[in-house]
UniProtKB/Swiss-Prot annotation:
HAMAP family: ThiG (MF_00443). The gene is thiG1. GO terms for cellular component: cytoplasm. It comes from the Bacteria. It comes from Prochlorococcus marinus (strain MIT 9312). The lineage of its organism: Bacteria, Bacillati, Cyanobacteriota, Cyanophyceae, Synechococcales. This is Thiazole synthase.
Length: 264
């Protein structure tokens, strides 16, 4: 990506590089205000949450789907077959929201209940099937450069390496691998999971990531709408810093004031 304002995924263009999740908020009002403050255009929706919702507080009815692009996710799936089934349901949910041509899916296959780390083998299997079914697949993966390239070659629309475990707020723990993924990728790289504060979102963008996806850092903040706004600023600042280009690191000091031709 060569400018801030253009993020292209699956043939669709977005002006924001911040994706936001819809889970874990204390109230629907917090969620709606946070989405607005974030300036996001893509929001993730857990298909299982919608499918099993018995409260009457239907997420599909709370969000303006003319403003936001739905990214259904397969959270809760433990194998490829299950993920494919949930992805199909997600596509139907998108149609119900009025997005008839929405084939996006955030692919999550997570059998590990303690650390919530994605299964690379089942993720590849599910991605192969979903791509053949016409989905724009956005796979959630460990920060593994080889796996990221393999999924890109399969036809995934992005790769989404984790910064650190979901909801941990530990930030970017594997900078070297994330940097390699960014360097090698020919599809957008979206950093997903573990970001806790705006400075970490900015750091991801400064590395050259094309975007970030954030949920817990916003939803579980003391003031979610304010945190959403702060992270929005962090993402924009990080992207601009990447485009501007940082100075080279040196092992010694270099004076910023001229030392010659100064009359005293």
């Amino acid at each position: 990506m060569d400018n801030y304002s253009s993020l292209r995924i699956g043939g669709k263009q977005f002006s924001s590089r911040l994706m936001v999740g819809t889970g874990k908020y204390k109230s629907t009002q917090d969620m709606v205000e946070s989405l607005s403050n974030s300036d996001t255009e893509i929001i993730t929706v857990a298909v299982r949450r919608i499918k099993n919702d018995q409260t009457g507080d239907n997420l599909l009815e709370k969000i303006n789907w003319k403003k936001y692009w739905m990214l259904p996710n397969t959270a809760g799936c433990v194998n490829a077959d299950e993920a494919v089934r949930i992805a199909m349901l997600g596509r139907e949910l998108a149609k119900l929201s009025g997005q008839e041509e929405n084939n996006f899916v955030k692919l999550e296959v997570i059998p590990d209940k303690k650390y919530l780390l994605p299964d690379p083998i089942e993720t590849v299997k599910a991605a192969e099937v979903l791509i053949k079914k016409g989905f724009a697949v956005l796979p959630y993966i460990n920060a593994d450069p080889i796996l990221a390239k393999r999924l890109e070659e399969l036809g995934c629309s992005t790769v989404m390496p984790l910064g650190s475990p979901i909801g941990s707020g530990q930030g970017l723990l594997n900078l070297s691998n994330i940097a390699i993924i960014i360097e090698n990728a020919k599809v957008p790289v979206i950093i997903d999971a573990g970001i806790g504060v705006p400075s970490e979102a900015s750091q991801a963008m400064e590395l050259g990531a094309d975007g970030v996806l954030i949920n817990s850092a916003i939803a579980q903040a003391k003031n979610p709408p304010l945190m959403a706004q702060a992270i929005n600023y962090g993402v924009k600042a990080g992207r601009q810093a990447f485009l501007a280009g940082r100075i080279k690191k040196q092992d010694f000091a270099i004076a910023s004031s001229p030392e010659k031709n100064i009359s005293i």
